[in-house]
Amino acid sequence: MLPMITGFMNYGQQTLRAARYIGQGFMITLSHTNRLPVTIQYPYEKLITSERFRGRIHFEFDKCIACEVCVRVCPIDLPVVDWKLETNIRKKRLLNYSIDFGICIFCGNCVEYCPTNCLSMTEEYEFSTYDRHELNYNQIALGRLPMSVIDDYTIRTIWNSPQTKNGVNPLI
């Protein structure tokens, strides 16, 4: 008789514990009902990236001294640096610089270790192409100024929305 009573007590305790867990989950679900949705409609709306976002690499040809530090610190030896030694001034002259973003892992080592700061990470992240060879950027493509996400039309429309003006930030 005693084992049967303890079995019923254990069953009752387990039932109460399960009901409490279900209630906790339901309360979490209810607490999310008054929040704004986090999902955005990507092609039409874009999130503002953080300051430390690692996007497309921007390259300034005039600052580069062809030291090849970026190639040495890259885990996959990605940047291709072509240079020629100028014998009259005994310095390297940069001929060509290219990065294939189809292979790049966006680790940021090249930007961090560059002694002349000719490399920087931008907030550009849209690299969609139909041909993977278009992802190989030379110094001209790397040197073009990136379009800032904040200047994008969709960001400006979200920022000027009535929800933002009422003190509710739709991006958070």
Curated annotation (Swiss-Prot):
Catalytic reactions of this protein: a plastoquinone + NADH + (n+1) H(+)(in) = a plastoquinol + NAD(+) + n H(+)(out); a plastoquinone + NADPH + (n+1) H(+)(in) = a plastoquinol + NADP(+) + n H(+)(out)
A Pfam family per the record: Fer4_9
Documented EC number(s): 7.1.1.-
InterPro entries reported in the protein's UniProt record: 4Fe4S_Fe-S-bd, 4Fe4S_Fe_S_CS, NADH_quinone_OxRdtase_chainI, NDHI
Cofactor note: Binds 2 [4Fe-4S] clusters per subunit.
Cofactor: [4Fe-4S] cluster
Cellular component GO terms held in the UniProt record: chloroplast; chloroplast thylakoid membrane; plastid
Signal peptide limits: none
Tagged with keyword NADP: yes
GO BP, sorted A to Z: photosynthesis; photosynthesis, light reaction
One Gene Ontology molecular-function label: 4 iron, 4 sulfur cluster binding
Domain 4Fe-4S ferredoxin-type: 55-84, 95-124
Binding site for [4Fe-4S] cluster 2: 74, 104, 107, 110
General function of this protein: NDH shuttles electrons from NAD(P)H:plastoquinone, via FMN and iron-sulfur (Fe-S) centers, to quinones in the photosynthetic chain and possibly in a chloroplast respiratory chain. The immediate electron acceptor for the enzyme in this species is believed to be plastoquinone. Couples the redox reaction to proton translocation, and thus conserves the redox energy in a proton gradient.
Family to which the UniProt record says this protein belongs: Belongs to the complex I 23 kDa subunit family.
HAMAP family, alphabetized: NDH1_NuoI (MF_01351)
Protein name as it appears in the record: NAD(P)H-quinone oxidoreductase subunit I, chloroplastic
Classification of source organism: Eukaryota, Viridiplantae, Streptophyta, Embryophyta, Tracheophyta
Gene field: ndhI
